[in-house]
Amino acid sequence: KDVDCLNPLNAGELYLGRSRWAPCTPRACMATLSHYGIELKGKHVVVLGRSNVVGKPVALLLLQEHATVTICHSRTQDLPGVLRQADIIVAAVGIPSFVKPDMVKDGVVIVDVGINAVDGKLFGDVDAAVAEKASAFTPVPGGIGVVSNMMVMDMLSRDL
């Protein structure tokens, strides 16, 4: 089973909005936002990361929900300025504590997908201090990773 939609046919179906499923971690992001009643329609969502496993697929899923999506990465010019415009940030850049409090506006929703091991401890891509400014914040560990694991189990149990 292709739980991360890496097969070119499945990736193409996802791109065209016709896929019966999506990669597990992007699905986990969407399920978490839905569970907590986070409105996406018309919201400016910045996806920080452009991987084929998280960044691009989650951007496609957000577009299907009528969000306005900007995809950024560690080399985006004036990244703090772009992030400060976001209503929602999905961080999947793979750099520990990369997003700092001065890079986001008050009330932002943070979905931290990053999982980075530093000296035996796990850190997300968003500095934990950002939680004080956020209206919603997924922690690392204990956030999207847990939901992503549930999505893997869901995919493996399906008769596709």
Question: How would you label these PLM feature ranges?
Answer:
Residues 19-105, 109, 121-123, 127-128, ...:
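Glycine-rich phosphate/diphosphate-binding loop of Rossmann-like nucleotide-binding domains
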Residues 1-14, 111-160:
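Rossmann-fold NAD(P)-binding glycine/threonine-rich loop
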